[in-house]
Amino acid sequence: MLGVPFIDRWLSETFKPKTFDDAVDRLSYVTTATLLAFFSIMVSCKQYVGSAIQCWMPMEFKGGWEQYAEDYCFIQNTFFIPERSEIPGDVEDRQKAEIGYYQWVPIVLAIQAFMFYLPSWIWSSLYKQCGLDFPSVISEAEALRSQDSETRTKGVNKLVDFIGDILDTRSKNEYGRFYCYRFGKGLGSMTSMLYICIKLMYLANVFVQFIILNKFLGNETFLWGFHTFADLYAGREWQDSGVFPRVTLCDFSVRKLANVHRYTVQCVLMINMFNEKIYLFIWFWFVFVLITTFINTLCTIYRLSFDSSRHNYIRSLLSGPVNNFKDEKAMIASFANNGLKQDGVLLMRFIDDHAGAMVTKEICEELFKKHGENLQHNRDFHHGHSTKSTSPGLEEGHHEHLYTPEKMKLMAPDYPIKHA
């Protein structure tokens, strides 16, 4: 990417995309984190390998004195006074005009890059506790895209069996509820709630990034980037605005025998020419990431939290005999709420994003068939033994109307039914 083998390899391995996320997640932890890391490395090379500061010294300064003064001014900050203004004689007034951020730009950029990567790292560390191996399932689904029809069918059946095993153990692992969410390992709602929290972390991180920019650069408004761009467009340069000044002043003292001599020198900060362009780009990029992340977070919450959204999505994946009749709507609701649940719908969306709609439809249709077969088996068991049904969710009063005898047509789809 950068043309430098070591840096290219390090960035690629560090900010490698994952399979269990969406494009907006990757916008933060891959694209933005890589950009910030690249800017950090670029500024570091200019600052510590090249010449970060050059000062105009008095005539009596020779060799080592000049190097000492430049190193001192770079470390101890410089201050900016507009050319048309008089240099204040009071030390406190000079300290108020100090610019102390340019030395820390590489470090702050590196910290910001890590902050964009942090939610992804937390997500990767915690999702395994929810009982579902997302990477394996999604990777297997991705591999099916390039297979022929017969091989893909066998692969789909294996995947469906694997997911079905998790579906069969969901009731044993659930141990709590919160509104429409169920807690526990397996396919309940634990993973979905965790993913929503991660989405909120991505969103909160962008807000924090704007606060960091303001505090670090000493701005009083969150519209700094817009104002700076407006100044540049209007021809108002740094000499007047004081934003990333190239020419600054520096005070330092030199002890000669028993006397201390105070000097004020004028310095050139070429690094600020890069910093201005970098931070102006970063500000507008953060605005784009903020808007995109905000919209995506709202959409994710809606898609995972509202029954209507989950039902509509599942209906779009089923190309079989699913019409808008009441019974068939109830069947889809049973499959989405008691079969897949929120975590299963989230898995279907990840597979859809990475493996494509065709593979996702085949997997979802097979899972739907298995769900219908399980309902038929439970219905037969219920009528044959006159006992309470063990169908998922029935003991909680959900979808009891699905299991009445007058709705036999719902339990008799056009695919073969397996009886226990």
UniProtKB/Swiss-Prot annotation:
<keyword id="KW-0472">Membrane</keyword>
<dbReference type="Pfam" id="PF00876">
    <property type="entry name" value="Innexin"/>
</dbReference>
<keyword id="KW-0812">Transmembrane</keyword>
<comment type="subunit">
    <text>Interacts with F-actin.</text>
</comment>
<feature type="transmembrane region" description="Helical">
    <location>
        <begin position="104"/>
        <end position="124"/>
    </location>
</feature>
<protein>
    <recommendedName>
        <fullName>Innexin-3</fullName>
    </recommendedName>
</protein>
<comment type="function">
    <text>Structural component of gap junctions. Plays a role in maintaining gap junction activity to promote phayngeal muscle contraction.</text>
</comment>
<feature type="transmembrane region" description="Helical">
    <location>
        <begin position="278"/>
        <end position="298"/>
    </location>
</feature>
<feature type="transmembrane region" description="Helical">
    <location>
        <begin position="33"/>
        <end position="53"/>
    </location>
</feature>
<comment type="similarity">
    <text>Belongs to the pannexin family.</text>
</comment>
<keyword id="KW-0303">Gap junction</keyword>
<dbReference type="GO" id="GO:0034220">
    <property type="term" value="P:monoatomic ion transmembrane transport"/>
</dbReference>
<dbReference type="GO" id="GO:0005886">
    <property type="term" value="C:plasma membrane"/>
</dbReference>
<keyword id="KW-0813">Transport</keyword>
<feature type="transmembrane region" description="Helical">
    <location>
        <begin position="193"/>
        <end position="213"/>
    </location>
</feature>
<dbReference type="GO" id="GO:0048598">
    <property type="term" value="P:embryonic morphogenesis"/>
</dbReference>
<feature type="region of interest" description="Disordered">
    <location>
        <begin position="378"/>
        <end position="405"/>
    </location>
</feature>
<dbReference type="GO" id="GO:0051015">
    <property type="term" value="F:actin filament binding"/>
</dbReference>
<dbReference type="GO" id="GO:0005243">
    <property type="term" value="F:gap junction channel activity"/>
</dbReference>
<dbReference type="GO" id="GO:1903746">
    <property type="term" value="P:positive regulation of nematode pharyngeal pumping"/>
</dbReference>
<dbReference type="InterPro" id="IPR000990">
    <property type="entry name" value="Innexin"/>
</dbReference>
<keyword id="KW-0407">Ion channel</keyword>
<keyword id="KW-1003">Cell membrane</keyword>
<keyword id="KW-0965">Cell junction</keyword>
<keyword id="KW-1133">Transmembrane helix</keyword>
<keyword id="KW-0406">Ion transport</keyword>
<dbReference type="GO" id="GO:0055077">
    <property type="term" value="F:gap junction hemi-channel activity"/>
</dbReference>
<feature type="compositionally biased region" description="Basic and acidic residues">
    <location>
        <begin position="395"/>
        <end position="405"/>
    </location>
</feature>
<dbReference type="GO" id="GO:0005921">
    <property type="term" value="C:gap junction"/>
</dbReference>
<dbReference type="GO" id="GO:0005737">
    <property type="term" value="C:cytoplasm"/>
</dbReference>
